[in-house]
């Protein structure tokens, strides 16, 4: 299963800093998304589902890249927040959409009942100094539990603040996460260690597996 929260191309800047690849020309952003979606599609099982959070203002790019990369779009779910996010629009945003689908020639697995809806109501986190667009862990855990079983692999190629990782840990899944920005990698590691300790955290350097505590002690994290 894939659960991810790519850059929205809205040039977000908060106290936690800017997000890489978040301010591109329209055509470049489409190509960026298309390449990412192709890689995801090629690394998914035939019966795996995919969930992609995005911004409505970039909905056309997300949907076109999603379908062009070989995904079937089953629907669009809505994260309804408990509070608005102040911006420049006449209508203030209080939701984020999430594409849901699977491989065009594949099928999908469903592990919940028939009462689940497209509206997901979860409180948004208070402003974080660690990451400008942190998702609540409970929000990420919801689709994970609907579309995967325990011990399944969940791929998040844009791991960001690490909410998918934390949700996988809580629900007994295995998270394969990728994060380009080093400062957010540090955020992910600190967030995980603060909750679960550093006993299972290692740095791989070539064939060497080094306990994170040793790396942190020598100041090279």
Regions found by a protein language model. Give the residues of each.
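S-adenosyl-L-methionine
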Residues: 189-221
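Core catalytic lobe of class I
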Residues: 1-185
